[in-house]
């Protein structure tokens, strides 16, 4: 079993940092559903502004709020306005890698969704892996893909 990316909120902006809360990251349920992120799921958080990398669990905020709130100790690593990547993962047998289609969501400055992408791993005629980033129409983008929220 290997740890594989399952979904990402890419370039979402921190709306609040609450040091006195119990811990976690509070996210809009609409955003979580788009990327396949579950409540209480452990996620990795990568801060594009500072380079900080942490792990915490997800709690759901108010639906439609576009919130991204770092709580407890995590609040020390991300400040309001920071652009972060929230990534969930699964453990998967390599034989099933071609059936996984991670969902990636990108955001504007106000945490409105810009792009809905997916990752795809396929086998070429020689049995080697090939990787694609697909847009909403399942069209492959150039790699590295320069999408509006990247």
Swiss-Prot record:
GO terms of molecular function: aspartate 1-decarboxylase activity
UniProt GO BP: alanine biosynthetic process; pantothenate biosynthetic process
HAMAP family linked to this entry: PanD
Catalytic activity: L-aspartate + H(+) = beta-alanine + CO2
Location of the protein in the cell: Cytoplasm
Protein name in the entry: Aspartate 1-decarboxylase 2
Active site: 24, 57
Source organism per UniProt: Mesorhizobium japonicum (strain LMG 29417 / CECT 9101 / MAFF 303099)
Posttranslational mods: Is synthesized initially as an inactive proenzyme, which is activated by self-cleavage at a specific serine bond to produce a beta-subunit with a hydroxyl group at its C-terminus and an alpha-subunit with a pyruvoyl group at its N-terminus.
The protein's enzyme class: lyase
Keywords assigned by UniProt, alphabetized: Autocatalytic cleavage, Cytoplasm, Decarboxylase, Lyase, Pantothenate biosynthesis, Plasmid, Pyruvate, Schiff base, Zymogen
Example of a GO cellular component annotation carried by this entry: cytosol
Gene name for this UniProt entry: panD2
Family assignment from sequence similarity: Belongs to the PanD family.
Assembly and binders: Heterooctamer of four alpha and four beta subunits.
Pfam families, per the entry: Asp_decarbox
